[in-house]
Amino acid sequence: MLIRWKSKDKSASSNQSVGGSSSSSSKKKRKGREGEEDWQNEAKSGRLPSNEQGGDERRRAMRRDDPRRHTLGGDMLVYGSQHPHAHQMAPQQQRAMDLEMSTRAQKNKKNQPMRGYAPVNQGPLFDDDPGIMSEVETASTGFRRGGKQRSSLPVVRTPSKTLERPLGLVFLQYRSETKRALLPNEITSIDTVRALFVRSFPRQLTMSYLEGPNVKIYIHDASKDMFYELEDVRSHLREIRDRSVLRLFESTEVAAPPQILPGGPGIPQPLPQAQANWDQDQSYFSEPEFDSDYKHQHIHKSKIGKQPAPYYVGSSQTLPRGMYSSERNKVSMDGYTSSPERSSRGNYEEPYYSQYGTRGAVVAPIIDEEQSDGTMTEDQYALYGIKVGPGPNRLTHRGNQIYDPTRPEDLHRIRVEHMERQLANLTGLVQKALVNQNPQIAPLAVPTLDPNYLVVPSQMQANGSGDELYIREKAPKLGKNSCQKSVSFEKSVSFSDDIQGIPKSHNPLHAAETKPTKPAIKSSTLPRTSSQERDRLKPPPPPKPIVLAQTAHPNYRADIALAPEVYNHLRGLQKKAKDLRMEVRTLRRLSQAQAVAVREDIKGTFMRIRATLLASSGSFWDHQGDQDATRISREEELYKQEVIRLEKDLSDLEGSVENLRGEVINRRTRVNMTAVEDMALVLSRASKTVAELKLKFPSLSNGLRCILSNEMEKVVREEKFLKEEPDRLESALRRCKKLTGTLVTLKRLASVQEQRLPPNEPTISEETPRSADISAPDKPIPTPRMGSFALSGGLAPENALDALLDELKTFSKPIAQQQQQQQQQQQQQQQQHQHQQLYEIRPEDSASDESAQAAVQSTVTTQISQARLYTEASVNVQQATTGSMVIAVASGTVSAQAQAQRGVLTHQQSQSQAQLMVHTNMGSLRRLHSYPSESDGELPGPPPTGPRASETSSSTSLANGGSSSKPPVPERNAELITKVGHKRIPPPPPPRTSSRSPLASPTSPNVPPNQAAAATVNLIPNSNSNASANANANANSNATGNKGIVGETTSVVSGDTSSGDNSSGNESGNDHVQRQVALEMRHQELLKKQKMLQEQYQRLQQMSKLPSVDVASSSSSSAQDIASGSNTLRKLGSETNIQQKIAALSLACETSGAAAAAAAAAAAAATNGGVVASDATSGAIGGGGGAGAAGAAGASAAAAHSNSNSNSNLNLNLNSQHQTATTTTKQLYETEIL
């Protein structure tokens, strides 16, 4: 197009812009040449000579006069102004036509390139005609609007003109071909998409063909990787974006050859004026259809105005139809008219324009949509005679051509494909409007299309305004073709078949001759042949109706004068037609969707049927063995029947033979040969039967054996299943329990690690023996901390593990088995605990960290053992021997020396703990902080301040053998933890009770402090033997320097949840009193339960055999023993329940196990200062100093002694422990050994 414009500008840029008629004629010639150049050199279209640009601007000025300057109509007006007739057009009429037809003109312009851009006027129109532009031009320049300056514009159009949509690529797939096309600025209708296809596949597709019912456009949905039909709905059209893939599906090949489509390249033979008129008609008619599109396309229109809307290839644009037709004929010859619509449009427009010269005449008859249908357009032309050439004869001839048998067939075929009924209605409406409003329009008889008609300049000029108006109108009609052409360029370009219809009216002439028409765009791109050539190529257009033929162009101009109203009316008709078409498309899509749904339903049903069949077939195969068995059984039956018959025959034969023999012998009768032969036959049959049966029997026997073997296998499998399944279930249950225990242990360890508090907690003494002070081997094994639980009963499961444990209780095995399992688990856990102790003891950590590590270790031990240890001693006695640190959790195992001094502290601690326990009410999980006493000869870390100090002092006093058992270190509250900077207090390595297990501590609210105190005191007597413990305790107490104060701090450490002030040391006294009361109450309860506990002594002995109870000579052995002892008591049940029960057991053992404690103390003394801790729950855990063996022996002896005595107080051995805590442990085992 740029080339065309350039050539036009070069030839007569001023003439093109200013002079309409003279320049138009030259432009026609140029456009004929340029059309060829354009399609060949569309890329060059970007260059518009300045002259052409000036001409375009002039055209723009004309458009400015017209309401649609920017539209194709504007260009057409400018073009018309170049033509005398165009100038003759009243400015109002032109404006109105511009308003209405500019969109149509754009569309028509799209169609025009197909028709050919021969007319000189069409030269500017050509520039304006987007159809004239090649894809390259439109791609590179956006598309020329005026064809003048637009060609020079950059590819990206200005936002106002391009609708602010950048160009994008769209991939068009037609059959096996895939092409790229530029997206239009805006896609307002499906016609734009069709135009894209027509433009990309000019030789294969035409707008009319695409509009057929058997051709559908599908868009690819990348997310679903599927194509779905593209509906002519904004929501669907918006989905066409850059890189979208559009596919054209057709049930049949392109039905009509391009010649059928109006605007076929061969068709554009009409005179340029006639073409111009036809353009006007087309744009006029097409405009309603494309109105919405063109409104969106106005930018394109403006562009087209500047450049003959390159997308509107149809010559129906402002270019003179004669020129278009001639060029289009060339195009058709070139084969660009292969797209039926484009070629047909161009042909119709050109022939009619050439014939009619005036666009006015053409305007009325042409409806782009109908024409785009091809048949409708031609019929419309024929009916309206709108494309009346300069001479009415030509119009008539053209009408005749429209009605020519060849043309009608193609047109009707296309019409049927493209909503024939709707188009027919539109045609009727348009005809009425044109005939009524424009009575002057008479069918111009144009028996033949002569190049003269195309060339007729007078008519062109006379109808110049009409042509311009018509072109504007036609541009909208071209919209379809133009849209086809410009589809890649703009949405705004609407694909109005009616616009094409004008060229289609030409098409009746051309379509028959040239079936292949290039897509509108390409046809525009193609050099336009002269209208004469087109006429030569095309059969003479069918004569138009007499009315149309009669109407002269001037008359048509008169109609054009009425054009504004007519255009509006036609526009409304076109819009209605478009709405109807949209509805039809919607219905079609709905039907398609329904068909898809039905297909899916059928497919689903098929799949279900198939699945059923497969299942049945599978069952068939499953029952194949049964079928074999049935077959064999049938064979067996047949075999038996044969045997029966055989035996019968033999018996009969034998009888007969014997009778005959007897008769012969006795009676000496003659033997009848026949009888003998009969018998011989029977015998032969019998012998054969026997042979056959003998042959059959092996296979039968094999089959029977197989069946029997299979049955035997089934029986064996069933028996094996019945026999092994219970064991399998039991093993699975055991595994579940084991895993549960492991998870519980890991949970405790994690909780301990997470709950450590910083050493400098305000409520807890910041200074505690540092891990550095205590060597890892010497560090006492943390006694298992009691799970939190209340004396009254276990708390609700704390977490999913507890719930799981409760559920597993139902499957718990007898206590003996449980104990064995627990022992094994305890041993494993002991090893883990030892490793964890080493791992968790960090010398760099503060005392709190150290205690936390110890607590972690204790947590690793079973909760039951922890509960016992804690409840018996109600204090964790930490004694570190030089060789090893053994935590002796014996309420009474404290050196006698430290008893007197620390008895008060322990009482205070117990009281404070009792208070704390009562306040906590098993609230947040609390852990009593006890600090490990340092190894003998080692002084404890600096005296702890605050509750931890008291805690430490209490532990040391107990280690020293204080008169009273060391009360458990006060528990930690969640509140206390929160106060401590949201860091969890590190659990002390010595046994501690969590807040959940108030029973564990002698100060638990349910137990009177007296009981607790008594229990603690009862367990103390043998603590004198623990020299090392005493030394450690003394050292610790000395280091602290405040023995009395230590107890207070310890009590404070546990903290009172209600008060929240656990750091006050004054509370220790009250705590001690409460603790004693709780202990006293517990003592009474435990005395009652002692007998019950003894009953379980036998069961507990198995657990008591564990070495953990004995005092180990080495710290490691003692640690293992302690861990094992704790493990024996350790259950996988919920920590709370186990701890509660263990606490009760431990208290009972503490009260009743004084003798056992004494024995344990003696054993400890034998161990050279080893500390014997007799814990009701966990037994006496002693860390021996020098001679661990002696300590162990003593401990065992003490355990045996305590066992002999009814006192079931826990000795070093677990036997005494379990004996004293029999009832509670039994319950614990039954409920929580899991």
Curated annotation (Swiss-Prot):
Residues 1-88, 107-129, 330-350, 498-548, 754-793, 815-852, 928-1011, 1028-1070 are annotated as: Disordered. Residues 1-11, 55-69 have a biased composition (Basic and acidic residues). The keyword Coiled coil applies. Gene3D superfamilies: Actin interacting protein 3, C-terminal domain (1.20.58.1540). InterPro entries: AIP3-like_C, SRCIN1. Residues 412-436, 565-594, 630-666, 1077-1105 form a coiled coil. This is Coiled-coil domain-containing protein CG32809. It comes from Drosophila melanogaster.
